[in-house]
């Protein structure tokens, strides 16, 4: 789930914290990628005639196709990816996992009804909702990455937390995920849309943690409390408190304890036995492997091993796999250049620049609303996954 409404809140109140870039602008960067998020995207998006790609025995191969070609694209653009896989979820996430199980049950019932009605659009819709990443998908992805010469890390718990630890330790430049809670875990940089297909033409969105805090005028601890109020994976939120009210409360009272002492409980329903303190602890001190003990190495691809793994029963085209392996080797050999900005120190933004960016964001928002009013808006426009 991530943090509900956080990306929009940052765009509205801390616009300088977001920068849009082309993928090529991350040349020379090492990036920790949320592997489970990627595999889910590939299982959903990589399809043929509406169905997942599959091996001879019917097992899906969409995740392998996506992982192979998107990783080649990253390396081709000079990016050195390291994939981080989820471990066991924390106990505090059991409530969120139970909700997801309920939604899957509902989707299964809806799929059955759509199948009986012969509604192809609804069948595809609910089939996608039932997609989930299994241990076998992850195992196969790790085997593929090993053959490609790309490192991966098994997180003891949450992948986003482990990615953030790698960033904070200077092992990588950024965390790449669609879940905004990478910022709550303290990742200095967060990249969204990095692993999206080229055809979607989505610029990469880069969030800067320091500029988020600066723009929202919060400390790191206050930011964590804000995220808990907005809605996270580890506990319920206060009913009636959305992003706007959450930031108002944090700025007024600075922490959840003081908010609870002053909030009108008749107006805002505080969850019974609300375990926000444990959620806070999970963000401040998550269960991660010490980044200093992790050695990241990118090695030459095993071309014959890739052919053996992907072709045959998995039905990949051998010529394309061999061409992909050659691209991997060429990219590795080319990655000896150094980014120019590694020689220079980046200066922090001035308060005047931040204020100017906020004014510009407000003007853009007003202009967009004005245009919507003139042309009538259209509820079908801009469909897609809602940012978290």
From Swiss-Prot:
Q: Which residues form a coiled coil?
A: none
Annotated Mg(2+) 2 binding lies at 179, 181, 233
Q: Where is this region: Disordered?
A: 355-388
Q: Which GO terms describe its molecular function?
A: 5'-3' exonuclease activity; 5'-flap endonuclease activity; DNA binding; magnesium ion binding; manganese ion binding; RNA-DNA hybrid ribonuclease activity
State how the cofactor is bound.
Answer: Binds 2 magnesium ions per subunit. They probably participate in the reaction catalyzed by the enzyme. May bind an additional third magnesium ion after substrate binding.
Q: Where does DNA bind?
A: 47, 70, 158, 231, 233
> For binding Mg(2+) 1, which residues are annotated in this chain's numbering?
34, 86, 158, 160
Residue numbers spanned by region N-domain: 1-104
Please tell me one Gene Ontology term that the record gives under cellular component.
mitochondrion
Q: What does this protein do?
A: Structure-specific nuclease with 5'-flap endonuclease and 5'-3' exonuclease activities involved in DNA replication and repair. During DNA replication, cleaves the 5'-overhanging flap structure that is generated by displacement synthesis when DNA polymerase encounters the 5'-end of a downstream Okazaki fragment. It enters the flap from the 5'-end and then tracks to cleave the flap base, leaving a nick for ligation. Also involved in the long patch base excision repair (LP-BER) pathway, by cleaving within the apurinic/apyrimidinic (AP) site-terminated flap.
Q: What family does the database annotate?
A: Belongs to the XPG/RAD2 endonuclease family. FEN1 subfamily.
**HAMAP family per UniProt:** Fen
Q: What is the name of the protein in this document?
A: Flap endonuclease 1
């Amino acid at each position: 789930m991530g943090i509900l409404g956080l990306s929009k809140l940052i765009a509205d109140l801390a616009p300088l914290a977001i920068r849009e870039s082309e993928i090529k602008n991350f040349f020379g960067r090492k990036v920790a990628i949320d592997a489970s998020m990627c595999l889910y995207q590939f299982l959903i998006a990589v399809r043929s005639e509406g169905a997942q790609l599959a091996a001879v025995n019917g097992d899906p191969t969409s995740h392998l196709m996506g992982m192979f070609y998107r990783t080649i694209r990253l390396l081709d653009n000079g990016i050195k990816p390291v994939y981080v896989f989820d471990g066991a979820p924390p106990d505090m996430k059991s409530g969120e996992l139970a909700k997801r199980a309920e939604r899957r049950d509902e989707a299964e019932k809806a799929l059955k009804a759509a199948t009986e009605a012969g509604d192809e659009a609804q069948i595809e819709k609910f089939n996608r909702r039932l997609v989930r990443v299994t241990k076998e998908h992850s195992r196969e992805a790790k085997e593929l990455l090993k053959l490609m010469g790309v490192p991966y890390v098994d997180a003891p718990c949450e992948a986003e937390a482990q990615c953030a630890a790698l960033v904070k330790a200077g092992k990588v430049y950024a965390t790449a995920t669609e879940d905004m809670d990478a910022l709550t875990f303290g990742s200095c940089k967060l990249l969204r849309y990095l692993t999206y297909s080229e055809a979607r033409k989505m610029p990469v969105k880069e969030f800067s943690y320091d500029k988020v805090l600066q723009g929202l005028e919060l400390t790191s601890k206050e930011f964590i409390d804000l995220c808990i109020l907005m809605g996270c994976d580890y506990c319920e939120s206060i009913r009636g408190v959305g992003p706007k009210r959450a930031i108002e409360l944090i700025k007024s009272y600075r922490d959840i304890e003081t908010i609870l002492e002053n909030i009108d409980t008749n107006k805002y329903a505080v969850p019974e036995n609300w375990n926000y303190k444990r959620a806070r602890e999970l963000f401040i001190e998550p269960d991660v492997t010490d980044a200093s003990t992790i050695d990241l190495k990118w090695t030459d691809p095993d071309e014959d091993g890739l052919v053996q793994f992907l072709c045959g029963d998995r039905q990949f085209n051998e010529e394309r796999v061999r061409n992909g392996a050659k691209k991997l080797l060429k990219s590795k050999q080319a990655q000896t250049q150094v980014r120019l900005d590694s020689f220079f120190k980046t200066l922090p933004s001035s308060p005047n620049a931040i204020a100017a960016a906020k004014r510009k964001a407000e003007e853009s928002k007003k202009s967009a609303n004005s245009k919507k009013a003139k042309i009538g808006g259209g509820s079908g426009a801009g469909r897609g996954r809602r940012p978290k």
